[in-house]
């Protein structure tokens, strides 16, 4: 039976604290609503002043709502945005969240049509068939990612931006594969098929980026502590993070539930067989111990294989080796010796080699398109396109990366920390370029961050021109900071992709690097190259803000520096 007496001092204090907390949350929520109204009003007011044409209308002839106008104004493809959101049911009465979800929904529908178009080809030659096959896989990845986006909370702004950035990357990679086939008609086919879905994806990304900035302004972003004593941090994918805590103690080899050994002393002799046993979409880690040996196989960690932890006997002892390459007819995206798509993947003490050699051009050793992935004390060994950091959030610590042309490339949000980056001797007539970052859209939260690494030659490269990188796409983003550069780096530092300059829209930066190759005195004079960042600007590319690492790396027990 309840007692209805006077509260003691302790209970009274708890009640008062609870009231203050609720009041604080209410103030924040009201502030958020007020700010959204102010910003929407400002945007719409600006649009009205700048637009002398008749206002766009919904399908039923009614004027487009204030929310639709505000959201479409921040997009890169406004006409497509008005067309898309204007067709939303009850668009004039829909909230920004509902309109965003609708934008994602119609993008899924459009990409499903695109997938059908790539799946129905007949009588194709080998190059066309290979490129179309790559597109089928990539568009499938995009659809899956958008479906996950549909079920996520709108407050998960970092996650949503990452996932929508990856959806754009998947479509761009499909286009790259079609261009690689070197058939103008195939390129035109791809451009026509992908135009609508690419614009829709870009618009959804722009909308969530803008909404995230509003939330940031009022400190209402997820994972932030409320100023209360009993507040908890909300982290990305909490069940997965909790599961990873199984890694916190003990020898991972002894914890392994699956053992692979060339000599037959394990359950399996190949890594592929071991992965087939892994439970799909498991929130807890599946630890696979791969004993020393050279495993001659192309390995794929599929998108449904979550939280796989693979441990070897050493980066020069447990080696995965294969030789797929572009010259022999495989699209770059599918040449990887080891390819990872399942989120939460971790590898340590392993080596990944593509043996194709420099004459075979693009030949990837490791390709990663898995969110929240980690590589610790691993070696990636090839020539052109060694390390394909394709998409999502990734972290590499104490790794060794060898290569020649564009050998760290892709469009992930990726941090390389305390790694050795070793350019090697290329083919005759070639020059070395370490990075080729593939950011295509200004709203993508992607880029390559090289932090506290060592850049030195593997071979004698005194007669070889070696550059820090070249901009693969229009918004290419690469930052090298607090790293050692040996004297073999060309004083110009960076190389254009084509012509004699780079797009003004790139973001390249060097910050507090050391060594005889680190001087920025004679660097190229590009508008997009920054050689005098402030500490605050450079810090944006460290683990904590750039890949949200403080929320998911601690559970892996891999050492990392969250900032400077």
Curated annotation (Swiss-Prot):
<feature type="binding site">
    <location>
        <position position="472"/>
    </location>
    <ligand>
        <name>substrate</name>
    </ligand>
</feature>
<feature type="glycosylation site" description="N-linked (GlcNAc...) asparagine">
    <location>
        <position position="196"/>
    </location>
</feature>
<comment type="similarity">
    <text>In the N-terminal section; belongs to the PMEI family.</text>
</comment>
<feature type="glycosylation site" description="N-linked (GlcNAc...) asparagine">
    <location>
        <position position="126"/>
    </location>
</feature>
<dbReference type="InterPro" id="IPR012334">
    <property type="entry name" value="Pectin_lyas_fold"/>
</dbReference>
<feature type="glycosylation site" description="N-linked (GlcNAc...) asparagine">
    <location>
        <position position="452"/>
    </location>
</feature>
<dbReference type="InterPro" id="IPR033131">
    <property type="entry name" value="Pectinesterase_Asp_AS"/>
</dbReference>
<feature type="glycosylation site" description="N-linked (GlcNAc...) asparagine">
    <location>
        <position position="147"/>
    </location>
</feature>
<keyword id="KW-1015">Disulfide bond</keyword>
<dbReference type="GO" id="GO:0046910">
    <property type="term" value="F:pectinesterase inhibitor activity"/>
</dbReference>
<feature type="transmembrane region" description="Helical">
    <location>
        <begin position="25"/>
        <end position="45"/>
    </location>
</feature>
<dbReference type="GO" id="GO:0016020">
    <property type="term" value="C:membrane"/>
</dbReference>
<comment type="similarity">
    <text>In the C-terminal section; belongs to the pectinesterase family.</text>
</comment>
<dbReference type="Pfam" id="PF04043">
    <property type="entry name" value="PMEI"/>
</dbReference>
<dbReference type="InterPro" id="IPR000070">
    <property type="entry name" value="Pectinesterase_cat"/>
</dbReference>
<comment type="pathway">
    <text>Glycan metabolism; pectin degradation; 2-dehydro-3-deoxy-D-gluconate from pectin: step 1/5.</text>
</comment>
<feature type="binding site">
    <location>
        <position position="362"/>
    </location>
    <ligand>
        <name>substrate</name>
    </ligand>
</feature>
<comment type="function">
    <text>Acts in the modification of cell walls via demethylesterification of cell wall pectin.</text>
</comment>
<feature type="disulfide bond">
    <location>
        <begin position="399"/>
        <end position="419"/>
    </location>
</feature>
<feature type="glycosylation site" description="N-linked (GlcNAc...) asparagine">
    <location>
        <position position="460"/>
    </location>
</feature>
<dbReference type="GO" id="GO:0030599">
    <property type="term" value="F:pectinesterase activity"/>
</dbReference>
<keyword id="KW-0325">Glycoprotein</keyword>
<protein>
    <recommendedName>
        <fullName>Probable pectinesterase/pectinesterase inhibitor 46</fullName>
        <ecNumber>3.1.1.11</ecNumber>
    </recommendedName>
</protein>
<dbReference type="GO" id="GO:0042545">
    <property type="term" value="P:cell wall modification"/>
</dbReference>
<keyword id="KW-0472">Membrane</keyword>
<feature type="binding site">
    <location>
        <position position="470"/>
    </location>
    <ligand>
        <name>substrate</name>
    </ligand>
</feature>
<feature type="region of interest" description="Pectinesterase inhibitor 46">
    <location>
        <begin position="62"/>
        <end position="207"/>
    </location>
</feature>
<keyword id="KW-0378">Hydrolase</keyword>
<feature type="region of interest" description="Pectinesterase 46">
    <location>
        <begin position="257"/>
        <end position="550"/>
    </location>
</feature>
<dbReference type="InterPro" id="IPR035513">
    <property type="entry name" value="Invertase/methylesterase_inhib"/>
</dbReference>
<dbReference type="GO" id="GO:0045490">
    <property type="term" value="P:pectin catabolic process"/>
</dbReference>
<feature type="active site" description="Nucleophile; for pectinesterase activity">
    <location>
        <position position="406"/>
    </location>
</feature>
<keyword id="KW-1133">Transmembrane helix</keyword>
<dbReference type="InterPro" id="IPR006501">
    <property type="entry name" value="Pectinesterase_inhib_dom"/>
</dbReference>
<feature type="binding site">
    <location>
        <position position="332"/>
    </location>
    <ligand>
        <name>substrate</name>
    </ligand>
</feature>
<feature type="site" description="Transition state stabilizer">
    <location>
        <position position="384"/>
    </location>
</feature>
<dbReference type="GO" id="GO:1902066">
    <property type="term" value="P:regulation of cell wall pectin metabolic process"/>
</dbReference>
<dbReference type="InterPro" id="IPR011050">
    <property type="entry name" value="Pectin_lyase_fold/virulence"/>
</dbReference>
<keyword id="KW-0063">Aspartyl esterase</keyword>
<feature type="glycosylation site" description="N-linked (GlcNAc...) asparagine">
    <location>
        <position position="90"/>
    </location>
</feature>
<keyword id="KW-0812">Transmembrane</keyword>
<dbReference type="Pfam" id="PF01095">
    <property type="entry name" value="Pectinesterase"/>
</dbReference>
């Amino acid at each position: 039976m309840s007692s209805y007496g006077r509260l003691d001092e302790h209970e009274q204090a708890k009640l008062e604290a609870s009231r203050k907390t609720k009041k604080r949350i209410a103030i924040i929520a009201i502030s958020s609503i007020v700010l959204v109204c102010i910003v929407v009003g400002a945007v719409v007011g600006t649009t009205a002043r700048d637009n002398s044409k008749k206002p766009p209308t919904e399908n039923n002839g009614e004027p487009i709502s204030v929310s639709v106008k505000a959201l479409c104004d921040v997009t890169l493809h406004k006409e497509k945005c008005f067309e898309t959101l204007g067709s939303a049911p009850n668009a004039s009465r829909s909230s920004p969240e509902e309109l965003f979800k609708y934008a994602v929904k119609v993008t899924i529908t459009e990409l499903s049509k695109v997938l059908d178009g790539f799946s129905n080809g007949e009588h194709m030659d080998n190059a066309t068939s290979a490129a179309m096959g790559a597109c089928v896989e990539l568009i499938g990845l995009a659809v899956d990612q958008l479906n996950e986006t549909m079920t996520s909370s709108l407050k998960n702004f970092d996650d949503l931006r990452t996932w929508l950035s990856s959806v754009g990357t998947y479509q761009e990679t499909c286009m790259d594969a079609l261009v690689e086939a070197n058939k103008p008609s195939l390129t035109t086919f791809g451009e026509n098929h992908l135009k609508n879905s690419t614009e829709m994806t870009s618009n959804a990304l722009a909308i969530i980026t803008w909404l995230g900035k509003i939330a940031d302004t009022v400190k209402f972003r997820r994972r932030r502590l409320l100023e209360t004593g009993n507040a908890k941090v909300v982290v990305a994918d909490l069940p997965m993070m909790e599961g990873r805590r199984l890694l916190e103690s003990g020898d991972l080899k002894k914890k392994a539930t699956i053992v692979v050994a060339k000599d037959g002393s394990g359950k399996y002799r190949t890594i592929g067989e071991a992965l087939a046993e892994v439970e799909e979409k498991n929130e807890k880690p599946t630890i696979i111990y791969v004993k020393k040996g050279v495993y001659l196989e192309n390995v794929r960690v599929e998108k449904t294989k979550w939280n796989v932890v693979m441990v070897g006997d050493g980066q020069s002892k447990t080696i995965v080796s294969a030789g797929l390459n572009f010259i022999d007819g495989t699209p770059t995206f599918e040449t990887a010796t080891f390819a990872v798509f399942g989120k939460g993947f971790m590898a340590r003490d392993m080596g990944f080699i593509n043996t194709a050699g420099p004459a075979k051009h693009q030949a990837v050793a490791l390709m990663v398109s898995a969110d929240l992935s980690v590589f610790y004390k691993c070696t990636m060994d090839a020539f052109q396109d060694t390390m394909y950091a394709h998409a999502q959030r990734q972290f590499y610590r104490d790794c060794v990366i060898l290569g020649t042309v564009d050998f760290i490339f892709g469009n992930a949000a990726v941090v390389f920390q305390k790694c050795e980056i070793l350019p090697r001797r290329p083919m005759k007539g070639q020059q070395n370029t370490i990075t080729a970052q593939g950011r295509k859209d200004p709203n993508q939260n992607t880029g390559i961050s090289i932090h506290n690494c060592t850049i030195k030659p593997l071979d004698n490269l005194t007669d070889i021109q070696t550059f820090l990188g070249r901009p693969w796409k229009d918004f290419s983003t690469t930052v090298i900071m607090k790293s050692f550069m040996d004297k073999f780096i060309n004083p110009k530092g960076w190389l254009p992709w084509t012509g004699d300059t780079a797009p003004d829209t790139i973001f390249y930066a060097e910050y507090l690097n050391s060594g005889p190759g680190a001087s920025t005195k004679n660097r190229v004079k590009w508008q997009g190259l920054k050689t005098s960042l402030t500490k605050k600007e450079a810090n944006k590319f460290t683990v904590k803000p750039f890949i949200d690492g403080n929320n998911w790396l601690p559970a892996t027990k891999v050492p990392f520096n969250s900032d400077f």
